[in-house]
Amino acid sequence: MNVPTDPLMRLADRDQEHDCEGYGPGKVCVRIAAVAELPTRAGHFRIVSFYNNRDAKEHVAMIRGNIVGAGDVATRLHSECLTGDALGSLRCDCRDQLLEGLKLISTMERGILLYLRQEGRGIGLINKIRAYALQDRGLDTVEANLALGFRDDERDYAVAAHMLKSLDVQSVRLITNNPNKIRALTGYGVTVSSRISHVIPPNEHNRFYLETKAKRSGHYIDYSGKPHLTEQSDAILIDGMPAPDDVIDNGELGRNDQPGAGVPMSRLTLK
């Protein structure tokens, strides 16, 4: 039998008979289904599809360079947004987040974008449209979710963590403004070595949405609109975020009552 020399194809072959006991509290099992080349407007990638036993959804990874066995891999978790990604909605910044994330990764030696089928922060497309209708009547994005009986964010990252494990990624530099993603991945055993900020300038339709994410959901967003894609290695202070006396101490992210509290971050200091 010919053994593939390509690292991704070796993983795919290995996963044809993959049958693990599950990963994390939910016993999530993920395996690679297929690998192909995918040229895009943002650059050339390889696309990897996955099976999983958690939600029966077909999540994919967009991969740049050789990430198998690598550490400090620039990684973006992008949740599906039909209205933004495909239809160009201006109510959110999802399409810009997706495209700019791919462009950023395409400039690097290696990187990953996980495209997760978690429409509407996990509440699904129909409920997202219902939430939009409530926002049309004056509620913000958090209030709309709560009014429908959901939490602010219903997403779960167990599958994403196992996707990274299946790709044999040793540690990630997470491209995110969301401290909950850092906390979730860390909780599932993923080593997050640092954060790369990913702020998109707002438009007149999504400015309030982005302000709400910063003020109410704890996202690290400077919603003044300045483009910002640099890696955060120095202490930062963002309007609406915890004050200077809330700076990380002893390797913990924020105070115990702040989103992301207690996340071990070996090389990151945030306010």
State where each predicted segment sits.
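Catalytic domains of riboflavin
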Residues: M1-K271
